[in-house]
Curated annotation (Swiss-Prot):
Domain of life from the UniProt record: Bacteria
GO cellular component: periplasmic space
Gene3D superfamilies xref list: TolB, C-terminal domain, TolB, N-terminal domain
Family per similarity comment: Belongs to the TolB family.
Organismal lineage: Bacteria, Pseudomonadati, Pseudomonadota, Gammaproteobacteria, Alteromonadales
GO terms of biological process kind: cell division; protein import
UniProt subcellular location: Periplasm
Protein name per its UniProtKB record: Tol-Pal system protein TolB
Leader sequence residues: 1-21
């Protein structure tokens, strides 16, 4: 039970974020290695000032992706252009970037706006410029025109970022996703807040406020529900809550531990940790019927289950080998296999969306870091350089990991790219935040 106590202590350490303000994202490493891209401020074709500059949102998204580095707009050779017809390829000859994003915004009826954007292949443009005048339309990698309402500027900015990211990398963008996390503001009557926000910290929404701890939020595959652990009734219970209707369902309230929920790929079941029969073991609960099926059966602690993408197996953390390590269990055969061997401890594993890697917490020399292991080669790479890292959650496109950590004595969220090169911190004002969970594609 000492090991479980340490795990629970680690889980309760991470509590950081503001309720009334967006989480900022401060990039700490990896900018120099990113791919340069030019984003020209979108042209406003209306009276006064534009309601919001969409290009700022696109620049922020691409910067936070860890893949791209938007150039300083002051260094761009052209401004006030919105289409390839105005693009002077010769002027861009010495600009070290692979593509240019440009566009325009103009009023289009009451509280509506017509947004146009184009993605230009700058490498090809520079090559063609050496050959003399060419047909500029061949340089357009993508072009879109959309009518949006006044409250959709941020959303459509993220949509443009998704399109640009996928066009240039072949990987689906994740800028329209959200994160869930638990905020604690000590001194309040109900200090524990279950929150969701856009991936970049904007548009925060409180789902639940409680005088007792809330823990371990996790998203359903359709992005409509969250499962989480609540102590509001003075004991651990697992609830599932619809984020749109706010309807809550009590799924598990057995004696002892009810913890670590994880949705199955079809959204119909939860893998959980229960101690109703003695030691903490892994169970699978049918959400509709509440029936619980025991999966592991060992005298050691088994906890932190998560699903393989095919829904046929689970990962879980167990000390059955003497120290916490990650194991897998096949749901049909019950066969258990050890997955991790390097490091002192390995905890909280989850399989990446492509099924090729596992993200987890690795303890080596007494330090907790986020790590990645290639499931085919078993190569282990420590990704983070922060301390007391916990609760890693992978973006649905598999490119980034968000997790909890500490910075200057305060518990914060952080992010790291899947190759470990790009790192960012999400500082907040008052309060603490823990247990980040990245949504699926929405």
């Amino acid at each position: 039970m000492k090991i479980l106590a340490k795990w629970l202590t680690l889980a309760t350490l991470m509590l950081t974020a503001q309720v009334n303000a967006a989480l900022d994202i401060v990039i700490t490493e990896g900018v120099d290695a990113a791919r340069p891209i030019a984003v020209v401020p979108f042209v406003w074709e209306g009276p006064g000032a534009a309601p919001q500059q969409i290009s700022d949102i696109v620049m922020g998204d691409l910067s936070r992706s860890g893949t791209f580095k938007p150039l300083d707009i002051r260094a761009l050779p052209q401004h006030g252009i919105s289409s390839v017809a105005q693009f002077a390829a010769a002027s861009w000859g010495k600009v070290g970037a692979e593509a240019v994003v440009m566009g325009s915004i103009k009023p289009y009826g009451v509280d509506q706006f017509l947004v146009n954007f184009e993605l230009i292949d700058l490498v090809r443009a520079q090559s063609q410029a050496l050959k003399g005048p060419q047909n500029n339309t061949e340089l357009v990698l993508e072009s879109r025109q959309t009518v949006i309402s006044a409250n959709q500027f941020r959303q459509y900015g993220h949509r443009i970022s998704d399109i640009v990211y996928e066009k240039l990398t072949g990987i689906r963008g994740a800028f329209l996703t959200r994160t869930a996390y638990v905020v604690v503001k000590q001194g309040q009557k109900a200090p524990y807040h279950l929150m969701i926000a856009d991936y970049d910290g904007y548009n925060e929404q409180m789902l639940l406020r409680s005088p007792e701890p809330l823990m371990s939020p996790t998203w359903s595959p359709d992005g409509r529900r969250l499962a989480y652990v609540s102590f509001e009734n003075r004991k651990a219970e697992i609830f599932v809550q619809d984020i749109y209707s706010q309807t809550r369902t009590l799924v598990s309230s057995y004696p002892g531990i009810n913890g670590a929920p994880s949705f199955s790929p079809d959204g119909k079941k939860l893998a959980v940790t229960l101690s109703k029969d003695g030691q903490p073991e892994v169970y699978v609960i049918d959400i509709a019927t509440k029936a619980a099926k025991r999966i592991t059966d060992h005298y050691s602690i088994d906890t932190e289950p998560s699903w393989y993408p095919d829904g046929k197996s689970l990962l879980f953390t167990s000390e059955r080998g003497g120290k916490p390590q990650i194991y897998s269990v096949h749901l049909d055969t019950g066969k258990v296999s050890r997955v991790t061997f390097e490091g002192e401890w390995n905890l909280g594993g989850s399989i990446t969306p492509d099924g090729r890697s596992m993200i987890f917490v690795n303890r080596t020399n007494g330090k907790f870091h986020i790590a990645r292991m290639d499931l085919a080669t078993r190569f282990l790479q420590v990704l983070s350089s922060t301390q007391l890292d916990e609760s890693p959650s992978v973006a649905p496109n598999g490119t980034m990991v968000i997790y909890g950590t500490t910075h200057q004595g305060k518990q914060v969220l952080a992010a790291v790219s899947m190759d470990g090169r790009f790192k960012a911190r999400l500082p907040v004002g008052q309060g603490e935040v823990k247990s980040p969970a990245w949504s699926p594609f929405l």
